[in-house]
Amino acid sequence: MFTKRKEKIHFIGIGGIGMSAIASVLNAIGFTITGSDLAKTAKTESLESSGIKVYYGHKAQNIEDDVTAVVTSSAISPTNEEIIEAKSKKITVISRGEMLAELMRLRYGIAISGSHGKTTTTSLISQIMMHAGLNPVCIIGGNHFNLKSNAACNDLSSEYMVCEADESDGSFLRLSPVINVVTNIDNDHLDYYGNVEALRVAFLEFINKVPFYGCSFLCFEDNVVKDLSKSANKKYYSYGFSKDYDFYVDRDSIRVEAPITYFTAYHNSECLGEFSVPLIGIHNVLNSLASIGVGIHLGIDIADIKEGLKTFEGVGRRLNKLYDKEITLFDDYAHHPTEIKATLSSVRNAYKNRRIIAVFQPHRYSRTELLLNDFEYAFNDADEVIISDIYAAGESPIPGISGEIICDVVRKQNNHVRYIPNIEDVLPVLDDIKKDGDIILTLGAGNIVRISNEYARKLQNG
């Protein structure tokens, strides 16, 4: 680790999915961890149960005199009074990304990047490595159900670390992985990058960050990633559905027996056999293939890779089944049009003869404005669509930008869409329109998960 002394480190916004994972690992290593957040949640309660002191509300007095460093995320304003207090005490203030980089610096790092699929791929690789006994330090952007956490540090002597590489604020360029994965590159986070070209340049820099003995796994089903590979100056392996790629899956071998997908994978034309994973969707076949490639590169036995995938229990908010009786209720984090389309396509292919009701809470005014026209085809696999107003995530409203204008765009391809501004008013509508056999799918990165969990409880209680 980066210091022999075990100082006290304070996290502002400790309940966030990325911040809480890093705090958990540092706590397991032996650092004294404190943190603050605005409200008590299941995650902050979990941190408290592990011995971490959590303050509720941001106050200057939360920065104790013996704090050595303060970690903050991009969601925290520079004018936050805890940051001001830390600086007045000459306490080092660093970003979440910088602390993550410190955790990786002296380890064999495996970093998973991409606009979509990071959390699932990170979780799959973690599961394979844990099953093989490598026991990596894990930093995951969702709750890994096998781990029952978004972090793992079960073996302090482990040389391996697996984490998501977050491109949203450029912090993934701080990391020093030996292996990296790029799942895809989409038009997202342009509020930070300014334009698509700058985003692509950042990903190319990430690809080229591996050392001479390292490598990248690049998904060639994504044309942007495939094009960037031409400028890569480090070793990489391609993966996808073509026999021309280093790792590939025979499309004809894919079969779905929901919730399990079976497929046959190859490495340089050598058949690796049939694999199964309890996930649906072509995108998850690709995520699984990336994890197979990483496992083989690490020297993990094929039997262990297969068993690791087979025993994967899933990750939070990635097509989680919350209820399955007269209707089936799923919840998913998808909020970008590409993610929504992929998720709905997966459900449609797995449950061909069932009616699908999609409930979507848009995320951020800026993202809605930027991606508005991309929503046109995103809901084509849904029979009924409900769209609420936008979850602001701290942003100020943009005049003319609302959930209603997304409805207008979606109606160009799907007439069965309705606008319900208040997400709290969705449940009575679902009660009115649902029929036995329906699939209800809630989508979004905001607080829609609270609504889906509430509806699941209501259904359970009759």
From Swiss-Prot:
InterPro entries: Mur-like_cat_sf (IPR036565), Mur_ligase_C (IPR004101), Mur_ligase_C_dom_sf (IPR036615), Mur_ligase_cen (IPR013221), Mur_ligase_N (IPR000713), MurCDEF_pg_biosynth (IPR050061), UDP-N-AcMur_Ala_ligase_MurC (IPR005758). Keywords: ATP-binding, Cell cycle, Cell division, Cell shape, Cell wall biogenesis/degradation, Cytoplasm, Ligase, Nucleotide-binding, Peptidoglycan synthesis. It catalyses: UDP-N-acetyl-alpha-D-muramate + L-alanine + ATP = UDP-N-acetyl-alpha-D-muramoyl-L-alanine + ADP + phosphate + H(+). GO terms for biological process: cell division; cell wall organization; peptidoglycan biosynthetic process; regulation of cell shape. Its EC number is 6.3.2.8. ATP binds at G114, S115, H116, G117, K118, T119, T120. One of its GO terms (molecular function) is ATP binding. It is an enzyme of class 6 (ligase). It is found in: Cytoplasm. It comes from the Bacteria. Pathway: Cell wall biogenesis; peptidoglycan biosynthesis. Transmembrane segments: none annotated. One of its GO terms (cellular component) is cytoplasm. It holds the Pfam family Mur_ligase_M. Cell wall formation. Belongs to the MurCDEF family. This is UDP-N-acetylmuramate--L-alanine ligase. It comes from Brachyspira hyodysenteriae (strain ATCC 49526 / WA1).
